[in-house]
Amino acid sequence: TGAGKSVCYQISALLLRGVTIVISPLISLMKDQVEALRQVGIPAAYVNSSITQEEFYHTVQMVQQGQCRILYVAPERLMTDSFFRLTQQVPVSMIAVDEAHCVSQWGQDFRQSYLDIPVFMEQLPARPICTAFTATATKQVEADIARILKLQEPEIIHTGFDRKNLFFGVRRPNNKTRELFQLLRENDGKSGIVYCSTRKAVEEVCDALRENGFPATRYHAGLSDTERAQNQDDFLYDRQPIMVATNAFGMGIDKSNVSFVIHYNMPMDLESYYQEAGRAGRDGSPAQCILLYSGKDVRTNDFLLQRSRETTEVEDEETRQFLLEQGKERLKQMTFYATSTTCLRHRMLQYFGDHSPDSCGNCSCCLTNYREEDATTAAKKIISCVYRAQKGGYHLSRTMTADVLMGSKKESLLRMRLDQLSTYGIIEKLSRREVMQLIDELIQREDLALRQFQEYQELVLTAGSVEIIRDQKTVMRRVPVVREKLAAPVGTKDPTLSAADNDLFQKLRQLRAAQAKHEG
């Protein structure tokens, strides 16, 4: 993310004869990149569902007359008769597949239409050079891309996933809105993005920020094209330095001075989180990437995964089930990151197959003091609760298990007669949050597992559960010595400015905004 993937195929296109076809799933990104190329004198165009038939014919004429060097196209248009005829009439020098992870069922954003790409290339008069680009491919996805696109002994270039100027942090606040306010005060006068998982959350968070004096705007697919464009410009030119948005915002946005990215809700997978967080600090300056986590995020994402299974364009039932299972596995890895007590950067880089030290010194886990605590007794109580619930015919989720162990008086729990279990209320020395954290740690260690049951995931026992009960394994957990305090990223100073410095800072912001507008 932000490493210059687009430049790779744009410069290559200028060195080749004929037209370069860039396959991209993002209509807004096509428009932005074509406009940027035209501003520097490079003839480019795009073909997608947003253009009229007249505009398409005009684009065809440009390509036929050699007046277009780079043609962006949506994957859905590749196999249409009109586009096929065009590609038979002009020399295609290169195919550039952007967001190439979309071709793989192992990827976080599989698109059925991407499977048309190898078929399309086979129908061309001569097979052109094929290049593929992605910011978020695991080793498995990388191999899948090469196989599906039929790349013969491809040159594979890794720029690495580590962005050393980014500080990664996770907070688990009781009140996310209050925590967000505090983070924004710590970054007063700076530009940043607040990501939310739903349109409703975007509206609520943006309204709350405005009501409390924060200069915020919003972006999601439910807004009109005009409003989205206006809000995007307000953010790019620092008229509204805080953008509250769904993941519909940010792809291809070239704004270098984003000082923070805050995730108000946890994304579905580490690929999405890395890509969205990576929009911070593109100028190389220290920047913060903060995740505000709660257990509710897991339940929300699990619901969204189930819903996506029903709305996917994939018709084959077996493939749909496979995609759902892959989504659940990615959500599990994302949850492991959010609940980790070890280096966040190491966990993320390890997921993508990058080597890294066990400790980076620039994440909230590395900068928090922990002590080791024997939690075997509490773990046995959790495992016993799951066992006795299953024996009684119950299917308990993570939260239901914690409620039983804490002796909750919730009406739903009492109605199910869960208070009759012998493990009801047997944990007294831990808070509910600590019980939930220990459950998550047991899942990470594979001493418990999650299994789909109806509309939610239930806890089930594993071989590790038996080992703990039989005293063949101990459970040690890391406990913060003091309440986690988010340290400033490496290289930053106290954010408080004097009156004179603040006046100068505001003038510099105005100057930068004017320059950005002038340069387009």
Q: Which positions does each model-derived feature cover?
A:
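Helicase motor core with emphasis on the C-terminal RecA-like subdomain
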Residues: T1-S6, S12-I21, S28-E318, E329, ...
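Broad structural signal for hydrophobic residues in well-ordered alpha-helices, predominantly aliphatic
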Residues: F120, I145, M348, R512-Q515
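Helix-turn-helix/winged-helix DNA-binding modules
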Residues: P125, I253, S340, G392-G393, ...
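A generic structural signal for well-ordered alpha-helical segments enriched in polar/charged residues
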Residues: R147, E211, F336, Q510-A514
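Short, charged low-complexity linear segments at domain edges
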Residues: F322-D354
